[in-house]
Amino acid sequence: MELTLWTYEGPPHVGAMRVASSMKDIHYVLHAPQGDTYADLLFTMIERRGQRPPVTYTTFQARDLGGDTAELVKRNITEAVERFKPKTLLVGESCTAELIQDQPGALAKGMGFDIPIVNLELPAYSKKENWGASETFYQIIRTLLKDKVNEIDKINPQRWKSLGRRPKVNILGPTLLGFRCRDDVIEIQRILSEQGIDTNVVAPLGSSPEDIERLIDADINVCLYHEIAEISCEWLKRNCGMEYTTTIPIGIKNTINFIHEVHEKLDLPLTNKGELENKSKLPWYSKSVDSNYLTGKRVFIFGDGTHAIAAAKIAKDELGFEVVGLGTYSREMARQVRAAAKDLNIEALITNSYLEVEDAMKKASPELVLGTQMERHSAKRLGIPCSVISTPMHVQDVPARYSPQMGWEGANVIFDDWVHPLMMGLEEHLIDMFKHDFEFVDGHQSHLGHTATNAPDNKETKQAQSNMNIQEKSILWTESGKAELTKVPFFVRGKVKSNTEKYALSKGLPEINDETLYDAKAFFG
């Protein structure tokens, strides 16, 4: 067990809560002590959802451990079914309750309810949140479809032709507390619709048990988030013959590749191939002269596997950055992240310790960090610009506006979120250079208006300035020195002048000529 201030993922029952809260007509009975009810805040505060999660806690206390906690579980299950009337019931236990070994899922199945009951056995001490979400989604699909898959033939992805209808796909993987999942779904549905493809079911987000039973009506599955949906997609492929996409449509190139993959699996002709690259502003900017400033910028990337791999591809192939660090906290995606890092000739960082990530960040010396809210705090301490690209996130990363990461509009959002911190850094750098120049006037009216006031006078500051002025006045610039100084570009002239005067003072020189300026340049490099 490790004590830490922050953690990238919660225990697996939080992942189960994410799936349950994303769906309709499902209820989750969680055998847990009173302290484990904190997870409600994740949905009401961070996700800013108008309703609390569909979860009933048994909330046992220390005094209950001396009695029959199994009866407490049964009572809560009965009350939840009678009150909420779910069409499917999930039953599981938190990390603390796992130690008691009451087996609430087995108890629920023996109580004679006429609704499907999904027994969630999530090993809290060896697995994490994303695995819990993936396993929960998989168990729901398996429970609701296990009888139907034996009654149907293997699904042909091209059957839409013989049925005389438009092709249909399922979009699998988006959940609450995922990174921009709601907006990603809208963007991908829009792209598919433009290609003449209908959406059959989106799950888990917004789906019901009836929708899960309709998954087999689609021709193929779109796996949007591998951490959540890949196991379910594999099960559907193995048992129903349903093909699924593997390309994540984040970035221009990946979005184009995604569209090609969908068309290829459906055997659907692609008619607007030449128009695809004009859907976003990112390619235009990458070809513009302004983007030259960004070429070769060092970037450090850390997040969940899906977003980290996609970010690395965009950074290298679409923005011309140099990726100096790539890693993930998701051990289920470690193999894919290592492969992506190998392509970049760097070593992947697989860890769930934010301190290790911060240490790697320091050693890499990046100019931009792309990570989670933890990396935002670390980058702030190190004075490096940062953009959040992955969960875990805070409320500021769940905007009320439309802000996807996937598709054409997602590329625009990424362009804004990544480029702006660097451009603002350039502005601060230029101001820092210009303020030393002769032509720079620091006394212009502030953009804050007339309310801006000067800092109060300080005797020590005045004395230091006076001493510095006396020292500067004691150094004489000769005509040859002044003439040589004017040849220095104005945006670095102030720094050269300052460095030369420091050099002259350190050497005890009474005047500065052209030779002194050359010597100072050689000294400071």
Curated annotation (Swiss-Prot):
Pathway: Porphyrin-containing compound metabolism; chlorophyll biosynthesis (light-independent). Coiled coil: none annotated. The keyword Oxidoreductase applies. Its cofactor is [4Fe-4S] cluster. Keywords: 4Fe-4S, ATP-binding, Chlorophyll biosynthesis, Iron, Iron-sulfur, Metal-binding, Nucleotide-binding, Oxidoreductase, Photosynthesis. Protochlorophyllide reductase is composed of three subunits; ChlL, ChlN and ChlB. Forms a heterotetramer of two ChlB and two ChlN subunits. This is Light-independent protochlorophyllide reductase subunit B. It comes from Prochlorococcus marinus (strain MIT 9312). The gene is chlB.
